[in-house]
Amino acid sequence: IVSGSPPASGGVALIDALNILEGYDLNAVDKVTRTHLIVEAMRRVHRDRAVYLGDPDFVQVPVARLIDPDYAAGQRASIRMDRATPSDMLPGVDAPSPGPSTTHFSVIDAKGNMVAATITLNFFFGSGLMIPDTGILLNNQMDDFSAKPGVPNGFQLIGGDANAIAAKKRPLSSSTPTFVMAPKGTMILGTPGGSYIIGMVLQGTINFMDG
């Protein structure tokens, strides 16, 4: 699996979630349990997104640790099969809102060249400002920074000091353009959806691998 690296948060979150879920046989459990396990994995990766991820030019992002199977095993050990984890044990994972203004396209040609591209203005019409005589709208990606640690942004995502605003710094993103290469074939995927992106790509990847 090949996916995006910070400041896009999706690749790290996707691999972390897949590592957590690798310890379960999702095809052997009922639909309710399957959904419960996926949700609990996503809650943990969004907690880590809030705490650790930011622009690697400005903060030390522990990518190797976050995608380590041993780290995922520790996350998995905290999941109860019979109940949801109390929210106060997972700060920074409030329910997200979907995003309206993102586009994703996946392309592969006859020679096997692949492109997975996620493009966004962030909110409807971005900042609402247009470059004169061009029709090009300016985005409002500044909202993807943590204006104040612990305070949600426009998509209700909680951030921390790692994603604080700084000059020349890039904001964190949920974009998750991904290539999945397996013996059964290759899948290119990504999606719009704001803070839902990581979870949707995770489910698409699981369905492809299990289907």
Regions found by a protein language model. Give the residues of each.
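Extended C-terminal regions of large enzymes
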Residues: P6-S9, I165-A167, V180-Y196, F208
